[in-house]
């Protein structure tokens, strides 16, 4: 077997007249009666190779037997294509290789779907079952290549900035906070379990206490939770931690890192500072803590209508301490029928809204089922507050603030997609700051950490941990890209007393805190530096930069929405002997 001299996708006019040895897969084969043309593919793309009896009758005879996805090696001379056969869509489109030697390395069965037809609609379950074939398709292969380019850019930045790449344990301890853990039974310690890490959070903090100053890791994390398009049971994050820093330092580093990656991978120079918005402002204006700012259509508070209008729904809501907010969709009045509005009402019901009131703006006022409740002054007030004009559709939700935000925030995004308001070429980054430290869980009747229990309260809010925990704000910050949470970070607690107080507010007894996190509390007593960091979702970042619709297209071997590998059939049953060794028994 000869040595390959170059990749198929790199054969260009620079190699004209030279002999090359290529190895790859038969992407396409065309027999023109006396001449056979083959597109030979490898990871860099494909090049046209020609079997011509004038160059080699023997090679032509062998080529007559090859089919799609055969693995072959060829030797030949790079020549210029005839002008009428030039393909300007590919890098190799000006040249072809006249083959004088071919060796069939391996034959292939007919694949269950076409590799060379990117437009063919293939059931995703079939693609996942034959993922090794799916990865041969150029679009998916390019996404995996982009993933490599992103991680390389990340490493270059962090290495240059003095960060140490340090691995942390995969078999660790289960903790009660956060999502459900994946558990690993211990054979040696009967009845005890390791947990796969949801994050290296505690270990990276311990590395700061150890004195390493700057840490990073591109790390696999695991969460046993319900899946959706932008979630996987195992996912990868760019994990970063720094000592002797404040919030501004971490955000500045994170922003510079993201700008470098976008420049390296997309060739886009993001020169402006990323905009910033408080959590309260994001919820008020967009109904979301991760707003998509590629389009306008903001939520507008029209609660004063509940005090001036004779409309019971608005009036009762405001009297009970709720609010009324409106969403004005530009030029949408004629695009939505009564049936469409019923469907939108059902949509907001999902988010807890009891209904969706709406009007269409016409020349002489409003039309629609609640138009009669609006006097002229009310019409003008709505126009003033929302910026609505003739031809617009205005929708209202009246409820408690959390329901209004969730329902209208989701409706805003849905309408933007339906009305084509989103520019998919935009990359709109946004920092969301000033997060609440805690949230109250109505089901468990206790406070839970908005981010995690190790996030530091703002200095001025330390006293509120005793008096009004729900009002305390965190030294926390999220980075949002095009309506997705790309990453989150915070300045951490580095004082044992404050950390113990935080555990107390979260409902831990001293004994529980010591049992679960005693090693961290002890470490704080030996001189812990102030520290903070950020974790960026790599899978999601690749998805957004590559313009894909779900995370599965960014991962070489992903799981389905039900956390199954269709290719390997994981998870699977294990033998009774294995269970016995682990002192486990399956209950059916």
From Swiss-Prot:
Keywords of the record: Aminoacyl-tRNA synthetase, ATP-binding, Cytoplasm, Ligase, Nucleotide-binding, Protein biosynthesis
Binding site for L-aspartate: 177, 223, 451, 492
SUPFAM superfamilies registered for this protein in UniProt: Class II aaRS and biotin synthetases (SSF55681), GAD domain-like (SSF55261), Nucleic acid-binding proteins (SSF50249)
Region (Aspartate): 201-204
Transmembrane segments: none
Membrane keyword on record: no
Binding residues annotated for ATP, in chain numbering: 223-225, 232, 485, 537-540
Reaction catalysed by this enzyme: tRNA(Asp) + L-aspartate + ATP = L-aspartyl-tRNA(Asp) + AMP + diphosphate
InterPro entries reported for this sequence: Aa-tRNA-synt_II, aa-tRNA-synth_II, aa-tRNA-synth_II/BPL/LPL, Asp-tRNA-ligase_1, Asp-tRNA-ligase_1_N, Asp/Asn-tRNA-synth_IIb, AspRS_core, GAD-like_sf
EC number(s) given by UniProt: 6.1.1.12
CDD domains membership: AspRS_core, EcAspRS_like_N
Compartments reported by the entry: Cytoplasm
GO molecular function, one term: ATP binding
A Gene Ontology biological process term: aspartyl-tRNA aminoacylation
Disulfide feature: none
GO cellular component: cytoplasm
Similarity field: Belongs to the class-II aminoacyl-tRNA synthetase family. Type 1 subfamily.
Function in brief: Catalyzes the attachment of L-aspartate to tRNA(Asp) in a two-step reaction: L-aspartate is first activated by ATP to form Asp-AMP and then transferred to the acceptor end of tRNA(Asp).
Subunit (UniProt): Homodimer.
PANTHER family attached to this UniProt entry: ASPARTATE--TRNA LIGASE, MITOCHONDRIAL, ASPARTYL/LYSYL-TRNA SYNTHETASE
Protein name: Aspartate--tRNA ligase
């Amino acid at each position: 077997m000869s040595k390959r001299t170059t990749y198929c996708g790199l054969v260009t006019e620079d190699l004209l007249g030279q002999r090359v040895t290529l190895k790859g897969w038969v992407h396409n084969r065309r027999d023109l009666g006396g001449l056979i043309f083959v597109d030979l593919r490898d990871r860099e793309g494909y090049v046209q190779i020609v079997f011509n009896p004038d160059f080699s009758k023997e090679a032509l005879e062998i080529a007559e037997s090859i089919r799609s996805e055969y693995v072959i090696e060829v030797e030949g001379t790079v020549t210029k294509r005839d002008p009428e056969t030039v393909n300007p869509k590919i890098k190799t489109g000006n040249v072809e290789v006249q083959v004088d030697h071919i060796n069939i390395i391996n034959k292939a069965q007919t694949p269950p779907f076409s590799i060379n037809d990117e437009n063919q609609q293939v059931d995703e379950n079939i693609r996942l079952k034959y993922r090794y074939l799916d990865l041969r398709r150029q679009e998916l292969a390019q996404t995996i290549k982009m993933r490599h380019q992103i991680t390389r850019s990340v490493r270059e930045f962090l290495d240059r900035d003095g960060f140490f790449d340090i691995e942390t344990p995969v078999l660790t301890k289960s903790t009660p906070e956060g999502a459900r853990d994946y558990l690993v039974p211990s054979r040696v310690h009967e009845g005890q379990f390791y947990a796969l890490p949801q994050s290296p959070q505690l270990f990276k903090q311990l590395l700061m206490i150890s004195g390493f100053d700057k840490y990073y890791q591109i790390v696999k994390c695991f969460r046993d939770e319900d899946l959706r398009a932008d979630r996987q049971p195992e996912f990868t994050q760019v994990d970063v931690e720094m000592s002797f820093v404040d919030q501004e330092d971490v955000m500045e580093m994170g922003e510079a890192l993201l700008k470098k990656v976008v420049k390296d991978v997309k060739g886009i120079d993001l020169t402006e500072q990323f905009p910033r918005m408080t959590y309260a402002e994001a919820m008020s204006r967009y109904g979301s803590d991760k707003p998509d700012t590629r389009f306008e259509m903001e939520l507008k508070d029209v609660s004063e209508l509940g005090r001036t209008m004779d409309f019971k729904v608005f009036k009762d809501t405001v009297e009970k301490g709720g609010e009324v907010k409106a969403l004005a969709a530009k030029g949408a009045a004629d695009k939505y029928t009564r049936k469409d509005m019923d469907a939108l009402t059902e949509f907001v019901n999902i988010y807890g809204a009891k209904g969706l009131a709406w009007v269409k703006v016409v020349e002489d006022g409003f039309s629609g089922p609640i138009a009669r409740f609006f006097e002229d002054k009310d019409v003008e007030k709505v126009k003033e507050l929302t910026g609505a004009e003739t031809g617009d559709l205005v929708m209202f939700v009246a409820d408690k603030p959390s329901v209004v935000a969730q329902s209208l925030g989701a409706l805003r995004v849905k309408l933007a997609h339906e009305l084509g308001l989103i520019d998919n070429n935009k990359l709109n980054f946004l920092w969301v700051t000033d997060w609440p430290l805690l949230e109250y869980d109505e089901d468990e009747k206790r406070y839970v950490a908005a981010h995690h229990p190790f996030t530091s309260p703002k200095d001025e809010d330390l006293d509120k941990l005793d008096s009004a925990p729900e009002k305390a704000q965190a030294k926390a910050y999220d980075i949002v890209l095009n309506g997705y949470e790309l990453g989150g970070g915070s300045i951490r607690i580095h004082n044992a007393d404050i950390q113990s107080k935080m555990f107390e507010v979260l409902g831990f007894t001293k004994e529980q805190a010591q049992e679960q996190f005693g090693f961290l509390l002890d470490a704080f007593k030996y001189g812990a530096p102030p520290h903070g960091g950020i974790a960026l979702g790599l899978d999601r970042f690749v998805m957004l930069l590559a313009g894909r619709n779900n995370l599965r297209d960014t991962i070489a071997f992903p799981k389905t929405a039900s956390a199954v590998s269709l290719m390997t059939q994981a998870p699977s049953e294990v033998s009774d002997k294995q269970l016995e060794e682990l002192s486990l028994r399956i209950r059916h």
